[in-house]
């Protein structure tokens, strides 16, 4: 098997997101001991990086997105205390987190930052990417909801991030809405316009049960960094399950550098028991992928459905029709109120 025409000797970069995207699955309530335990297990399994933050990135703890059990800095410091191999990553959404928050995360131990914008708004990432480069951080551009942009338009946005200083750009399937052709086309489009030394990453969600398949196709098209989480812990139906992707990569003959059995143990013994709502494809999470809705809307939509006596699926489908994107969580209640009014008239 080859990776984008190169020998399979190309080692994949395994980026774990259990302690960031996975935070959505438990409404950002990781305790410090839990964070340490998960980080230690991941480090012992030799993943390349461990992303740590509120589910919505630095300073995501808020009324709009949900308050975290701890601050981002507390979580990052907890991971820094135990990891010996993996680099600590964090996520920053311009407009939620600031350059000051990025500096604080760096001081706490983060050495990688993924600067995340909606797939058409890369221009708002400039000052954050430039600061990250000044701090000598591994600087990544993260284009959320990539399914809402054509491959060529997405590539243009990635090129902007590269021009600001990003050394890696991600195709991000925030809604778990893409199929394998969608992913392949976008990765190939990025590879065509980015400099050869600029890496490409894939961040998949499992809402259509395609998280692992999409990650494999992305690697075949030229992606080298792969996001995944233990037991798929993440928003919606979760991310590509890390232990499943690694098993598949092993079968493909790809080098990944991790310990599959340690990952399997960590997924089942440590992470899965934390889920107060099973992270799986079900009626509600399938609706996310089918309607192309931001995966972290799930728990908010469930709460609104319960409050206003509505089906969560109806709320999610309407959000998809209105093309709501990450950062518009406040509109979930507006949509619920509109639907509730329609049922009474």
Curated annotation (Swiss-Prot):
Mn(2+) binds at residues 21, 203, 205. SUPFAM superfamilies: Aldolase (SSF51569), post-HMGL domain-like (SSF89000). It comes from the Bacteria. Its EC number is 4.1.3.39. It is an enzyme of class 4 (lyase). The active site is at residue 24. Keywords: Aromatic hydrocarbons catabolism, Lyase, Manganese, Metal-binding. Substrate binds at residues 20-21, 174, 203, 294. It catalyses: (S)-4-hydroxy-2-oxopentanoate = acetaldehyde + pyruvate. GO terms for molecular function: 2-isopropylmalate synthase activity; 4-hydroxy-2-oxovalerate aldolase activity; manganese ion binding. CDD domains: DRE_TIM_HOA (cd07943). PROSITE patterns: PYR_CT (PS50991). Pfam families: DmpG_comm, HMGL-like. InterPro entries: 2-IPM_HCS-like, 4OH_2_O-val_aldolase, Aldolase_TIM, DmpG_comm, DRE_TIM_HOA, PYR_CT. GO terms for biological process: catabolic process; L-leucine biosynthetic process. Residues 12-264 form the Pyruvate carboxyltransferase domain. The record marks 20 as: Transition state stabilizer. PANTHER family: 2-ISOPROPYLMALATE SYNTHASE 1, CHLOROPLASTIC-RELATED, HOMOCITRATE SYNTHASE-RELATED. Belongs to the 4-hydroxy-2-oxovalerate aldolase family. This is 4-hydroxy-2-oxovalerate aldolase 2. The gene is amnG.
């Amino acid at each position: 098997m080859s990776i984008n025409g190169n020998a399979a000797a190309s080692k994949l970069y395994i980026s774990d997101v259990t302690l960031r995207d996975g935070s959505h699955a438990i409404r950002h309530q990781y305790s410090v001991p839990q964070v340490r335990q998960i980080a230690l297990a991941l480090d012992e399994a030799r993943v390349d990086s461990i992303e740590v933050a509120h589910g919505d990135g630095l300073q995501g703890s808020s009324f709009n997105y949900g308050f975290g059990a701890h601050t981002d800095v507390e979580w990052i410091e907890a991971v820094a205390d135990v990891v010996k191999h993996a680099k600590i990553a964090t996520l920053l959404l311009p407009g939620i987190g600031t350059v000051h928050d990025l500096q604080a995360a760096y001081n706490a131990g983060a050495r990688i930052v993924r600067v995340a914008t909606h797939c058409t708004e890369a221009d708002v990432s400039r000052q954050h990417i430039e600061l990250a480069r000044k701090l000598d951080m591994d600087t990544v551009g993260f284009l959320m909801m990539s399914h809402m942009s054509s491959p060529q338009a997405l590539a243009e946005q990635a090129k902007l991030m590269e021009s600001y200083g990003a050394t890696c750009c991600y195709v991000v399937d925030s809604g778990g809405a893409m199929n394998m052709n969608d992913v392949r086309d976008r990765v190939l489009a990025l590879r065509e316009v980015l400099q050869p030394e600029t890496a490409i990453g894939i961040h998949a969600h499992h809402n259509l049960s395609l998280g692992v398949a999409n990650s494999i196709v992305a690697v075949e098209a030229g992606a080298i960094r792969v996001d995944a989480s233990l037991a798929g812990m993440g928003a919606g139906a979760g991310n590509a399950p890390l232990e499943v992707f690694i098993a598949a990569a092993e079968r493909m003959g790809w080098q990944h550098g991790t310990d599959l059995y340690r990952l399997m143990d960590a997924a089942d013994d440590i992470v899965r028991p934390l889920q107060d709502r099973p992270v799986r494809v079900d009626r509600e999470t399938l609706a996310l992928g089918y309607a192309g809705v931001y995966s972290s809307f799930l728990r908010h939509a469930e709460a609104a459905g319960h409050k206003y006596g509505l089906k969560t699926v109806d709320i999610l489908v309407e959000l998809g029709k209105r093309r709501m994107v990450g950062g518009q969580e406040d509109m979930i209640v507006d949509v619920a109120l509109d639907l509730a009014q329609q049922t009474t008239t």
